[in-house]
Amino acid sequence: MAIEKVIIQNFKKFKNPFEVKFNENINLLVGDNESGKSTILEAIHVALTGMYAGRNIRNQLSTYLFNREAVEEYLASVENGQPIAPPEIMIELYFKSGTLPEYEGNGNSEKSDGIEGIRFTISFSDKFNSEYESLLKTEKIISLPIEFYEAKWFSFSRDEKMPRFIPIKSVMIDSSNYRYQNGSDVYISRVVKDFLEPEDITAITQAHRNMIDEFAQNEAIQSINEKISAASTVMNGKLSLSADQGVQNSWESSLVTQVDGIPFAHAGKGAQCIIKTQLALSHKQAEKASIILIEEPESHLSFSRLSELMGVIEKAASGRQIIASTHSSFVANKLGLENLILLSGDNCCSMQSLKKETFEFFKKVAGYDTLRLILCKKSILVEGDSDELVVQRAYMDTHEGRLPIQDGIDVMTVGGVTFKRYLEIAQTLKQRNSCCYR
């Protein structure tokens, strides 16, 4: 099961319908900051699972999910007395043909028949028409009336769906996101719990309750409670200290996950990232998921540890579709430049027109900084370090002391062997590159 294409409209960065196509196996989203890489991953995940930032999207509806320009246009129309329709978020996932025949139809923005997919919307609900009309007449609207919105899922056959019944599942892995509760990482605790069988959870609950009971029976605690009771002036009842027995699964908030005897929150950030990713790829939810979404797997990792992680991700890709965002040339080279999807403004392009030997070269020699060329606006390619110094000085002498990088021009030393391969990348991107000192 794989996604062939995604169309996003009015969700965060993307106002106009934005289309991106995917390979069946590995896909790498690259682009400058704020280019929409994370937004695409979030859009796919919420459309398949109904989850956003770890919570049900129905409980997370907010004006900040909408494209700001679309919201401002709507508010301006209301202020001018000619209100347009409230903006609507639309996310469409197009599945590989033959994956889910029952999801086939023309209920998509392209109005095309014979296509399988799911359509997710956050839109104004008609059942609130009277309330909305009253609001327009009686109050000044200065923000999107999100209380009148609802989230819905439809197959392309126009049948309404619940996300938990969508056969294609995704898992979102963001190892750089840290959410701590009582010193324990919420994400890692949830993943570890997922490994446990019901009898294991029962055993932990019983052991935790026994620990609380022992605390209450401790002689020192009983003596302290007697002092507190004697010193207090409460009219009814006695004051005392006790461990909170809480609810049935209270152990989840009081126990912490450890790595080699060290609480997970106090382990190195690099170790945390690689452990999170490895566990997330191997836990039950990921095993059931056919689509793995990974946010910047290189976070906090050294070159050698990142190399190990690439092997784990490549292994996980077997039989599943992986869509990852990255700023790392090593990740891009190792997982294949042919899988690259470059985001730029409202457009995207792939690198599949590169020669096969170029893909293979950068896979074998993954240390080259290919993304530096791919993401820059303009570049000057030179063969050696001395050439770079000469070009930098020549540019300064003719541009009032300014360095090329200050004008958005990146001077790159690429060496003689890789020169033609960098040129091939530049030609694929149709960038304007100046090549000096060959």
Feature names for model-found ranges:
Residues 378-382, 386-438:
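Conserved helicase/translocase motor-coupling segment
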Residues 1-49, 250-372, 388-393:
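Switch/communication elements of ASCE P-loop NTPase nucleotide-binding domains
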Residues 192-275, 279-291:
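Extended helical coiled-coil dimerization/tether regions that scaffold
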Residues 62-78, 355-375:
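Surface-exposed acidic, glycine/proline-enriched linker/cap segments
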Residues 43-112:
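Conserved P-loop NTP-binding catalytic core
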Residues 87-91, 113-118, 146-149, 166-170, ...:
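Short glycine-/polar-rich loops that comprise or flank the Walker A/P-loop
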Residues 90, 96-218:
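Electropositive, glycine-dotted interaction segments
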Residues 81-86, 110-113, 144, 282-287, ...:
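Conserved catalytic network of the ASCE P-loop NTPase/AAA+ motor domain
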